[in-house]
């Protein structure tokens, strides 16, 4: 019998230094911290999903063929160029497992989505950071294209991850800059378009011409399916085939696959929801901009980054008024800042009132 195990000693060094991901949950608070779509599913969609003949006693279709065919119609990418995952987080880790590891490196542009670095650390992939540039006068973030290309020239670099629009800043980077990095880097370029439906911009149309381009998308944001964990990668069949070698079998459950197929039939309804959320976010941004002490950063997503004089106080007082937003800690180039996404219109009305009382 083992009385005591030295777990820290047995852990891989790259895991030993990591902190477990924690999501905050406060009862009776309006959740504006996770960039979700708060609007209900389109009428009839839930009934259609629950009425589907799903064999819960059987393993799901390991190839998610019906879903990939629906995604092919939606994106214009052939089904053999599509890989589905248990949320984008699984796909990010799959990318690091396949093309990273202890002899590989990835280039990222902080501040950006934290899971890129987390997945890299778990897999022992080296992380090279090329921070964004900040134009203080316009409060716009920019890619350091030359810096990214210089970092990517190092032989151990296999991947570059570009988040567009970027989380947490909301920045939409110019298409020509992204395509220049794809063309000149000679490395795998992953463009995370989780919020692409809100910006209306995409580089998916360039996949036929760029064998090193992967575009990652999700059903968690506009399609309001965060609870079902469904993401997908788009690329040329050769690179998707390589990733399939390391993919876990049956990684997307039958219920989520069917939900994705059905959701894609409601494109017009979801597009209207996107317009509503963007208009609501603009209303919140306008209210924040009225306060000279608050920096509001430009956004092309369904969330915004802002910086009051005392972020910690604003965060805590909003909780006291029934609103949970995201405290971003000390962001590179920015310092302490807060991020919020939109609630329902009536919730946003209350939020604007609460912000006015706190910031006055």
From Swiss-Prot:
Binding partners and assembly: Homodimer.
Family indicated by similarity: Belongs to the class-II pyridoxal-phosphate-dependent aminotransferase family. Histidinol-phosphate aminotransferase subfamily.
Pathway entry: Amino-acid biosynthesis; L-histidine biosynthesis; L-histidine from 5-phospho-alpha-D-ribose 1-diphosphate: step 7/9
UniProt GO MF annotations: histidinol-phosphate transaminase activity; pyridoxal phosphate binding
A biological process from GO: L-histidine biosynthetic process
Top enzyme category: transferase
Top-level taxon of origin: Bacteria
Organism listed in the record: Desulfitobacterium hafniense (strain DSM 10664 / DCB-2)
InterPro entries recorded: Aminotransferase_I/II_large, HisP_aminotrans, HistidinolP_aminotransfase, PyrdxlP-dep_Trfase, PyrdxlP-dep_Trfase_major, PyrdxlP-dep_Trfase_small
SUPFAM superfamilies: PLP-dependent transferases
Listed PANTHER family: HISTIDINOL-PHOSPHATE AMINOTRANSFERASE, HISTIDINOL-PHOSPHATE AMINOTRANSFERASE 2
Enzyme Commission number, as recorded: 2.6.1.9
Protein name: Histidinol-phosphate aminotransferase
Keyword Plastid set for record: no
Residues bearing the modification N6-(pyridoxal phosphate)lysine: 221
NCBIfam families: hisC (TIGR01141)
Pfam families: Aminotran_1_2
Catalysed reactions, semicolon-separated: L-histidinol phosphate + 2-oxoglutarate = 3-(imidazol-4-yl)-2-oxopropyl phosphate + L-glutamate
Keywords: Amino-acid biosynthesis, Aminotransferase, Histidine biosynthesis, Pyridoxal phosphate, Transferase
Cofactor (UniProt): pyridoxal 5'-phosphate
């Amino acid at each position: 019998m083992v009385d005591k195990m030295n777990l820290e000693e047995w852990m891989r060094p790259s895991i030993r230094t990591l902190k477990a991901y924690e999501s905050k949950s406060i009862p009776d608070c309006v959740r504006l911290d996770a960039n979700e779509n708060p609007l209900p599913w389109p009428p009839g969609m839930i009934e259609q999903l629950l009425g589907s003949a799903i064999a819960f006693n059987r393993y799901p279709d390991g190839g998610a063929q019906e879903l990939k065919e629906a995604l092919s119609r939606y994106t214009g990418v052939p089904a053999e160029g599509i890989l589905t995952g248990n949320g984008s987080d699984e796909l990010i880790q799959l990318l690091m497992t396949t093309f990273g590891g202890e002899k590989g490196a990835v280039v990222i542009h902080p501040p950006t989505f934290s899971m890129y670095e987390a997945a890299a650390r778990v897999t022992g992939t080296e992380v090279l950071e090329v921070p964004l540039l900040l134009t203080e006068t316009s409060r716009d973030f920019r890619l350091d294209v030359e810096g990214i290309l210089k970092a990517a020239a190092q032989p151990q670099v296999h991947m570059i991850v570009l988040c567009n629009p970027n989380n947490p800043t909301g920045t939409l980077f110019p298409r020509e800059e992204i395509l220049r990095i794809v063309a000149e880097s000679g490395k795998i370029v992953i463009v995370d378009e989780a919020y692409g439906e809100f910006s209306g911009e995409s580089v998916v149309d360039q996949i036929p011409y760029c064998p090193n381009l992967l575009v990652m998308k999700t059903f968690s944001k506009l399609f309001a399916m965060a609870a079902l964990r469904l993401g997908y990668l788009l690329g040329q069949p050769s690179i998707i085939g390589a990733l399939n070698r390391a993919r876990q079998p049956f990684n997307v459950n039958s219920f989520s696959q069917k939900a994705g197929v059905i959701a894609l039939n409601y494109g017009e309804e979801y597009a209207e929801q996107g317009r509503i959320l963007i208009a609501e976010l603009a209303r919140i941004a306008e209210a924040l901009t009225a306060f000279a002490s608050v920096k509001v950063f430009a956004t092309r997503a369904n969330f915004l980054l802002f910086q009051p004089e005392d972020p910690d106080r604003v965060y805590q007082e909003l909780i006291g008024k029934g609103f949970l937003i995201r405290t971003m800690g000390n962001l590179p180039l920015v310092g302490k800042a807060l991020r919020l996404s939109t609630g329902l219109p009536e919730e946003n009305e209350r939020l604007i009132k609460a912000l006015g009382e706190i910031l006055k």
